[in-house]
């Protein structure tokens, strides 16, 4: 079981670049969010196969430093696709 962060680097306000953080389980995602100082209210699509956090570049680096696995946005998209397929079985 793992936590993953992508390399989307989507432009946000004031020059921020945002990525996505997701995990194999909600518990792992919450644990990593807590460890890097994210507010749990910031979770996107809680309890669904799309569950993730949007994180800035500095939080992405912090998550990697605490064990998150960096992946490309394409790999993360494939993981989401597989989660969705599993959900609808």
Predicted regions and their residues:
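The feature represents the first ordered module of a protein
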Residues: 2-32
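Terminal leader/tail segments of proteins
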Residues: 2-3, 14-18, 35-41, 60, ...
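Short, flexible coil/linker segments at or flanking structured domains
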Residues: 9, 41-43, 51, 59
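A short, structure-level motif marking secondary-structure boundaries and short turns
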Residues: 13-16, 43-46, 88
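A short, structured beta-strand/loop element
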Residues: 23-48, 65
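Short, compact, well-ordered microdomains
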Residues: 49-89
